[in-house]
């Protein structure tokens, strides 16, 4: 069927498939970041319950390092902020790509409209 289609429509279909793949990839990234956000929030909630002089260890690569509650809270808050910004950025990209997907879909349907009858 695609060999019967004009090159312009074939190109639009290829773009549509590419945009669809990009939206799926962004959706996966968004899910991963949301999971990381949830982990950070849970860790922060646990830290807040501890005494200020509690002994805390955190993982850094292959090492486990002793740290303070204050430093751990600060790092987790920074991480939450960074993840939130990344999530906002991904959401904006996802919105733009979804709009582009719908636009391409409409263009293809309009171009194929007379052929479908």
Curated annotation (Swiss-Prot):
Subcellular localization: Cytoplasm
Main location: cytoplasm
GO terms under biological process: chaperone-mediated protein complex assembly; protein folding
CDD domains, alphabetized: Prefoldin_beta_GimC
Domain of life: Archaea
Molecular function GO labels: protein-folding chaperone binding; unfolded protein binding
HAMAP family xrefs: PfdB
Function comment: Molecular chaperone capable of stabilizing a range of proteins. Seems to fulfill an ATP-independent, HSP70-like function in archaeal de novo protein folding.
Official protein name in the record: Prefoldin subunit beta
Natural source organism: Methanosarcina mazei (strain ATCC BAA-159 / DSM 3647 / Goe1 / Go1 / JCM 11833 / OCM 88)
Classification of source organism: Archaea, Methanobacteriati, Methanobacteriota, Stenosarchaea group, Methanomicrobia
């Amino acid at each position: 069927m695609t060999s019967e289609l004009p090159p312009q429509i074939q190109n639009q279909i290829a773009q549509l498939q590419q945009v669809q793949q990009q939206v799926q990839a962004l959706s996966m990234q968004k899910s991963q970041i949301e999971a990381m956000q949830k982990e950070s929030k849970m860790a922060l909630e646990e830290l807040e319950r501890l005494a200020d002089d509690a002994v805390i260890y955190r993982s850094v690569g292959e090492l486990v390092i002793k740290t303070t509650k204050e430093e751990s809270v600060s790092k987790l808050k920074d991480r939450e902020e960074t993840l939130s910004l990344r999530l906002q950025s991904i959401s904006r990209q996802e919105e733009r790509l979804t709009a582009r997907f719908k636009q391409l879909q409409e263009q293809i349907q309009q171009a194929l409209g007379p052929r479908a009858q």
